[in-house]
């Protein structure tokens, strides 16, 4: 039977990296966010910094509503039957980065060519760059230039998340 829904392992992976915030805040992309990364309520209304605090139970309801979009994206983009853990890992990846990131990634190409290819782990780990232009005196993007304009930083949180997703994918 084809897997089309994330299970509790997948939910736990996402919540462990997203973290819970009861009050609205601006995420690194400068978007008002609440709960476990929710930017729109199930009604479709955007989160506002003026909104009231929510409980963990409400946040989980919002997260599950949000995840349904990413489950559909992973299901439609992957042309092979995935295991539950493979599906969970790809939904977590897509929830964090967006459906377009998965759609255009070498990760998806590898998954669709051979879902058990061990080099897929390396493709998860390509997606560990982000940041706001903070300088760290390193060549984070490997092009031989240190702290040039537009250089993205390797973020420890993204390294941990992509590693956890890759590990789940292969269990």
Regions found by a protein language model. Name each.
Residues 14, 86-94, 123-125:
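Short alpha-helical scaffolding segments that buttress acidic/His motifs in well-ordered protein cores
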Residues 1-31, 36-47, 54-71, 81, ...:
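Long, amphipathic alpha-helical surface segments
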Residues 73-76, 96, 100:
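Amphipathic alpha-helical interaction surfaces
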Residues 65, 92-93, 97:
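Short, residue-level hotspots on alpha-helical faces of the histone-fold
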């Amino acid at each position: 039977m084809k897997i089309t829904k994330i299970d509790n392992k997948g939910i736990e992976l996402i919540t462990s990296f997203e973290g819970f915030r009861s009050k609205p805040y601006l995420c690194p992309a400068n978007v008002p966010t609440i709960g476990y990364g929710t930017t729109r309520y199930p009604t479709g209304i955007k989160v506002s910094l003026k909104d009231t605090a929510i409980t963990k139970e409400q946040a989980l309801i919002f997260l599950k509503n949000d995840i349904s979009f990413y489950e559909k994206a992973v299901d439609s983009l992957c042309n092979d039957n995935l295991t539950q853990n493979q599906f969970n890992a790809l939904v977590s990846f897509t929830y964090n980065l967006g459906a377009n990131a998965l759609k255009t990634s070498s990760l998806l190409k590898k998954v669709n060519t051979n879902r058990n290819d061990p080099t897929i782990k390396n493709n998860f780990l390509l997606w560990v760059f982000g940041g706001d232009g903070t300088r760290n005196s390193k060549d984070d993007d490997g092009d031989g230039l240190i702290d040039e304009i537009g250089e993205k930083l390797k973020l420890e949180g993204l390294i941990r998340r992509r590693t956890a997703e890759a590990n789940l994918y292969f269990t």
